[in-house]
Every structure is written in C-alpha cells, then in structure tokens.
Amino acid sequence: MAEPLTVSPELTANYAYFFDLDGTLAEIKPHPDQVVVPHKILQLLDRLAAHNAGALALISGRSMTELDALAKPFRFPLAGVHGAERRDINGKTHIVRLPEAVVREVEALLRSTLVALPGTELESKGMAFALHYRQAPEHEAALLALAQHVTQHWPQLALQPGKCVVEIKPKGTNKGEAIAAFMQEAPFAGRIPVFVGDDLTDEAGFGVVNHAGGISVKVGVGATQAAWRLESVPDVWRWLEQINYPQQEQQVMNNRRDGYESFSRSI
C-alpha cells in the first residue's frame, strides 16, 4: 500500500524527475482541450530541471505537440502517446510508426462505431487512438469491447485502459519503457528516478522506477504499485514548491491544519 509522501527530496540529491500531466500537474477537465497547467507550476518545473542538470521530462498519453503547447513557453524532454513518441534533451525525436493502411482502417472502424455511442469521442494521435467516455460512462463496456476487437484483429496494437478513456496504442510502448529509455541517456543516466502519476497508464512507469530503487508517487486514490501517494493535484503543486524552496518546508508542514497532509516518511 502506498504511504503518504511526507518529505521532499533534497535538491542536492542526484534525482531525475518524470511527471505525468493530466491528473498530476493539471486538474482533469471534462474535455482534454480545457486542461491548463498553471504558469507558476511550469516555472517550478523549469527551476527543478535547472537544479538537476535538465533531468526532468513529461511522460503523458498526450502527443508531444499537445505537451509543448501546454508547457509554453518552456520546452522539456517529452514522452508522448505513452512512449510511442519521445524527444530527448538534445531535441532528437524517437517515434514508433504504424503502417498508414492500418491507421486508416482502424480509424475508419472506430469512427463508424462511435456514431452509435453518443457522448463518446475519438481522439486520433497518428499511431494511437483514444476512446473517451467521460461524458458517456454508460458506454465504457462497449468501448472496451471495441478496443479488444481492434487489438485482436491488428495484433501490432495493444489496449490500455485509463480514467474515462480506452487507449489503443502500438504494442510494446508504455510509460515504463519511455522512462527506461531516458534513464540510459544524459542527463538522466546515473540518477535516481522519481515518477509522479495518477492513472492506470502510469503503473508501468512505477514498476520501472521501483526496480531502479527510485521514488514512485501515485496521485489520488486507487490500488497502485507506487510506494508513495499524494492526495490531489494541488498536493503535487505544493510538493513541487517544497522541492524548489526547501527552506519553506517547515512552515508548510506547520500549516497542515488546512487539510493538506504533507509527507510522513523520510525519502
């Protein structure tokens, strides 16, 4: 069981930071286009990266184009579409591609099927697809069955359930593999990985970080293999501030009576 995270890592330690975005750095909204990362949080991320030789990356199911737009004016190393696309510290991209015919056929099937499922939404990511049902939770089972059908018919694809979404992505891509790839490269190599995420899609990342002796942090409720837990997105924001300004940590700890439980075990 994940324990409440109660002590922020020291800036002098040799850490590499990885953050999911939706539900971790930004509150989840009814539609993905409504999500915003507060500018102050982006500034904290940039400061944290600077204190760690640039060893900070965003790891998300969103595309890298979306991540760059949400992170403006800052530019971080990224893994988008659950690791199907990745950009390293030098700006070099690594992209998993599917045959164009497969993409066309899958997208056509999904679009035609979703017409009969009002309230659902198809998001095409080029090499992956997201079937959203936040506005129509009654269609969850139908979308899972549809995704299972697709992955059985096209074995190069894999199903990834998430929060009010079912993802169809290239087989073998996940956030854990993306983190592992970053950890083989400068400036991440040789550091202790820290990964913060909130969803089922983040569990592969937690597994890789745990195996490396790092710090895995689950945001919110639910079963997880993460070792630590923060209750909400605002708690992540406060934790980021503590990491960046450790001299203020004691004051924050003294203000927990507002309902924020800080950290309960030393990292």
Curated annotation (Swiss-Prot):
Gene3D superfamilies: HAD superfamily/HAD-like, Trehalose-6-phosphate phosphatase related protein, domain 2
Classification via CDD domains: HAD_TPP
GO-annotated biological processes: trehalose biosynthetic process
EC numbers for this chain: 3.1.3.12
Protein residues bound to Mg(2+): D20, D22, D198
Transmembrane segments: none
Active site: D20
InterPro entries: HAD-like_sf, HAD-SF_hydro_IIB, HAD_sf, OTSB-like, Trehalose_PPase
Gene Ontology molecular functions: magnesium ion binding; trehalose-phosphatase activity
Entry annotated with the keyword Metal-binding: yes
Cofactors required: Mg(2+)
Residues noted as binding substrate in the record, renumbered to the chain: D20, L21, D22
Pathway per the UniProt entry: Glycan biosynthesis; trehalose biosynthesis
Record's catalysed reaction(s): alpha,alpha-trehalose 6-phosphate + H2O = alpha,alpha-trehalose + phosphate
Disulphide bonds in the chain: none
Cross-referenced Pfam families: Trehalose_PPase (PF02358)
Alphabetic keyword roster: Hydrolase, Magnesium, Metal-binding
Function: Removes the phosphate from trehalose 6-phosphate to produce free trehalose.
Similarity comment: family membership: Belongs to the trehalose phosphatase family.
NCBIfam families in the cross-refs: HAD-SF-IIB, PRK10187.1, T6PP
Descriptive protein name: Trehalose-phosphate phosphatase
Organism: Salmonella typhimurium (strain LT2 / SGSC1412 / ATCC 700720)
